[in-house]
Amino acid sequence: MKIALVLLSLLALTLAESNISPPVVKVYTAEPVDFGKTNEVICYVYNYHPPRLEMRLEKNGVEIPDCKQTDPSFQHNWKYYTTKSTHVHIDKGDKVECVVSHNGNPSKKYRLDIF
C-alpha cells in the first residue's frame, strides 16, 4: 500500500512538472515616452504555469521602490498572468527593465524599448 502511494505521488509530481510553461513578458508605457517627464511603466507577464513568479522593475540597474503588483490570475487556458507597474521619470539614455524569475529559475531581464 505504501509503495502504491509513493508511486502515485511521484506520478502526480511528474505530471505537474510536465505542465511548466515559461512566461511571456511585455514591458511598455501607458503613454508615448517623452524624455524628461514621468510615465507609467508596466510589466505584463502572462502565459506562465505554475504561478511561482518573482518580478521587479529596475531603472539603470537599481530596483524601483513602491511598485504596484496585481495578484496572479488565470486565463481561459489555466495559465497565469500578472502585472507590475510604477510611475518613473525617464530621461534619454535611461535603461528601464522588468526582471522576472519563474519557478525558481534564474532571473531574466526584459528591457523597455525607448525610441
Swiss-Prot record:
Location in or out of the cell: Secreted
Residue ranges of coiled coil: none
UniProt keyword terms in alphabetical order: Immunity, Immunoglobulin domain, MHC I, Secreted, Signal
Gene Ontology annotations for the cellular component aspect, listed alphabetically: extracellular region; MHC class I protein complex
Cited InterPro entries: B2Microglobulin, Ig-like_dom, Ig-like_dom_sf, Ig-like_fold, Ig_C1-set, MHC/Immunoglobulin
Domain Ig-like C1-type residue range list: 22-113
Signal peptide: 1-16
Domain of life: Eukaryota
Alphabetical GO biological process terms: antigen processing and presentation of peptide antigen via MHC class I; immune response
Family from the record: Belongs to the beta-2-microglobulin family.
Entries under PANTHER family matching the protein: BETA-2-MICROGLOBULIN, MHC CLASS II-RELATED
Main function: Component of the class I major histocompatibility complex (MHC). Involved in the presentation of peptide antigens to the immune system.
Subunit structure: Heterodimer of an alpha chain and a beta chain. Beta-2-microglobulin is the beta-chain of major histocompatibility complex class I molecules.
The protein's name in its UniProt record: Beta-2-microglobulin
Gene: b2m
